[in-house]
C-alpha cells in the first residue's frame, strides 16, 4: 500500500527574484551604484565577475541588463497582483543595499528606498503573500568596493550590521522571515559579484577569497542583531 504524502498546512508556495534581476531604476530616488549594475553581457563578463578585470562604472560599448531589468521598481504593484492571481503564498526577494544606503557607509539611510520596500511588503500582504527577504543577493554598494575593497575588509561587518538593524527596525511586523546572504559559495567562483572583490596582478586570490568568506559568513553564524 502506497502511503499518501501531503504538504503540511501553511506550507509556503511561491516564487523568487533578486533585486538586481528585476528592479532596474539603478539611479532612481537616491539609489547608489552597486557592483551588480556594472556587470555587462558579453565576452568581458566572465573576467569582470571573477574580479580579474576592473569595471567600477558604466563604459561605452557595453550592455548592462541590471540598469533597467524588468523595471519592477515602477511596476511592482502589477507584478504582485499577478503573483496573487497565481496563488503565491510567499515571495522571496532581496534588498538592493545601495537603495537603502547609497554608498554603504552612511550613518542614516535613504528614506525613499525604505519607503519603496515598505510599500512593496504591504502590497504582498494585501494578496496574502508572505515576504521572505534575502538581505544581500550578489549586491554591494560600489563605494564599499572602491573605498574599502569589498568583503576582504572586516569593516564591512559594521556596515552590514547597520543595514540589518535598519531593515529589522523599519519592517518589524511586515517581514517575518529573513535570510542573510544568497550563495556565499559564489565568492569562490564569481568573487566580484559575491563579495565585491577585485584582484591586483600577482595577488594571492585564494587567500583573499577565503579571508572574505570568513568575514561574510560571520553574520550567518551569529548575527548580533
Regions found by a protein language model. Give the residues of each.
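N-terminal structural segment of carbohydrate-active enzymes
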Residues: 2-110, 120-123
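Substrate-binding cleft and catalytic face of glycoside hydrolase catalytic domains
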Residues: 50, 78-213
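Single conserved hydrophobic/aromatic residue that forms the stacking wall/gate
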Residues: 214-225
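Acidic-residue sensor for enzyme active/binding pockets
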Residues: 23, 183, 218
Amino acid at each position: 500500500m502506497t502511503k499518501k504524502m501531503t504538504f503540511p498546512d501553511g506550507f509556503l508556495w511561491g516564487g523568487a527574484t533578486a533585486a538586481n534581476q528585476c528592479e532596474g531604476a539603478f539611479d532612481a530616488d537616491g539609489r547608489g551604484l552597486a557592483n551588480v549594475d556594472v556587470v555587462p553581457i558579453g565576452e568581458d563578463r566572465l573576467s569582470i565577475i571573477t574580479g580579474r578585470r576592473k569595471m567600477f562604472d558604466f563604459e561605452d560599448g557595453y550592455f548592462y541588463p541590471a540598469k533597467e531589468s524588468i523595471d519592477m521598481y515602477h511596476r511592482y504593484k502589477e507584478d504582485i497582483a499577478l503573483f496573487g492571481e497565481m496563488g503565491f503564498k510567499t515571495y522571496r526577494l532581496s534588498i538592493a543595499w545601495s537603495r537603502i544606503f547609497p554608498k554603504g557607509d552612511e550613518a542614516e539611510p535613504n528614506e525613499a528606498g525604505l519607503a519603496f520596500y515598505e510599500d512593496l511588503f504591504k502590497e504582498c500582504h494585501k494578496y496574502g503573500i508572505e515576504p521572505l527577504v534575502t538581505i544581500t543577493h550578489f549586491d554591494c554598494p560600489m563605494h564599499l568596493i572602491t573605498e574599502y575593497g569589498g568583503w576582504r575588509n572586516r569593516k564591512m561587518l559594521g556596515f552590514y550590521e547597520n543595514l540589518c538593524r535598519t531593515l529589522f527596525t523599519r519592517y518589524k511586523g511586515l517581514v517575518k522571515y529573513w535570510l542573510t546572504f544568497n550563495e556565499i559559495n559564489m565568492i569562490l567562483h564569481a568573487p566580484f559579484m559575491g563579495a565585491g572583490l577585485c584582484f591586483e596582478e600577482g595577488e594571492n586570490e585564494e587567500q583573499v577569497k577565503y579571508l572574505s568568506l570568513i568575514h561574510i559568513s560571520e553574520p550567518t553564524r551569529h548575527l548580533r542583531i
